[in-house]
């Protein structure tokens, strides 16, 4: 089989670059293809140059692939990271260097070779001769170990040392029986490197592969050497160091699959096998976050922070999350900006649900307490990612750095395939994880134990809920990683009337008796019961657990308790929430509406506000799910009611920041975090939002003036009303409709950064 090629020009934000494009014959001819602007990627068009096709044999194409991989190591990759919509006959193919996948394809469907210009003659013969020379079985100089004295195969290990800029290398010649390395030394110097990290497992290379590996002469360690006792001559211990990323790029034809199978990830700087196990564990713990989300991104983040921007090793790589011309620092800061907005939105929504009677000031105070840098700094260190905390003294100048890392993870998950749902899953299992609760050593009273069991069975009465709350208050619990917030939580929970708490329970809790976490030995204290109940009410995380007090010390099967989401889940779960029709009927639908009105401190008054709400609902150019118009009108009435819409405004403000951050992140992949922040702020000022409010039908302004006879044209009330209307759309119609509303009205108001 032969591989066809075309000369083409790739036009990106960095300007045009010329390539030889190789593709497999079975894909057929291509009329042209377009590079889409994916999340974090710039748009690019590809144009074919006139001229004959280039035809290469499979062997020659493989040589070209090897040659280009070497060039990429020397010059850095400059081709697009993700190609989509590549004609009608070509499937989607994500082609990135370095590869962060466990089993890369044996031969790349697309292979790119940089050219001086698209019109220059391509001397394939010279190219193949050059590549063949690199692949021929040539020996290293006498400075290095003579391969002719080696056995049929070699063992090696991946080794890293911070004294050499955290660059990572394959050390060829480490005996398979050797369990550790003693130290690094530099030739002709008295320096001894004592800090190093090596993989626990050996890498096996065939002798036939060694000439190819040895021929790749990069400017790495030059005359560094390492004592290698065992089967090696102690008088000539010099060995060749090879950056492992190059091994990962070589085609499978050269039998380096064992190296590829190590799944090289940046944080191998401590121990590659431990990191792989961690990634697998994270994947099992957070299956809904998406593989493109926090796990892989955190690996890249950790590795680059370890490198500390020295410009070698890890810092020289381009990640799939960053477009051309954007540094790693800029990529992380952009994701931090996005994650901060997403975190603020989810926390705001959950607090509104958890504390329906709290004032806006109290809610803001709670939110600031939950997302403060010190709390997030602690959370990052409890995620179970190994070895990172050990480097904190060297890497973290401020505690804010770790908090930024958490926000970067949230932002990365948000840009992944699961979006806001992946973020909710991640927050539910990290921000409010079981490690943050304080258990009580004493046994629960029988009354509390029985009440707990009845709660789990769905048969609890109001007095039994109250007994759990009172017991929790007496014992004291630690929630949200803050004793101050814990106290505020208990006060709010204790202030809820028992009968209302029962309504919360019946409305918001669905039971799943076949899943859930367990404490040590399957026994969890009643303090954990209340703590997990709080988490369930707020984040929909795995619920509370019951200690079954029996003579045999057997544990009851604990349920998992997802809860009432305070926004558009009502649209997506009609079975649970009933039919939100013109005249809601049934206990569930009535209770839901009553709960919303209680949370937002609203009592329907009809009149002009009802008419205005109907008018606004008809003027919205957004997708509105069927059956939600009455619900939307009720919420729009709240949005137009003075001194009542504050909580809607709080939610709308949080969603506006989140939505604008996402849109700007996708539309401007090369801008820095500072530029994106300035652009977002230009569109969310009160003056801009006030002007948008005045563009609604005149009845809206009439209602506002009726409520504020002396209102000034530039009053903050207009901007607050817009945010409240946005929140009403969010609650009634969901994120898609609210996002469309932001795109239609707010996004055009963004001022481009100079």
From Swiss-Prot:
Annotated GO biological process: regulatory ncRNA-mediated gene silencing; RNA processing
Record-linked InterPro entries: Dicer_N (IPR041279), PAZ_dom (IPR003100), PAZ_dom_sf (IPR036085), RNase_III_dom (IPR000999), RNase_III_sf (IPR036389)
Cofactor detail note: Binds 2 magnesium or manganese ions per subunit.
GO molecular function per UniProt: metal ion binding; nucleotide binding; ribonuclease III activity; RNA binding
Keyword field: Endonuclease, Hydrolase, Magnesium, Manganese, Metal-binding, Nuclease, Nucleotide-binding, Repeat, RNA-binding, RNA-mediated gene silencing
Function noted in UniProt: Involved in cleaving double-stranded RNA in the RNA interference (RNAi) pathway. It produces 21 to 23 bp dsRNAs (siRNAs) which target the selective destruction of homologous RNAs.
Protein name listed in UniProt: Endoribonuclease Dicer-like
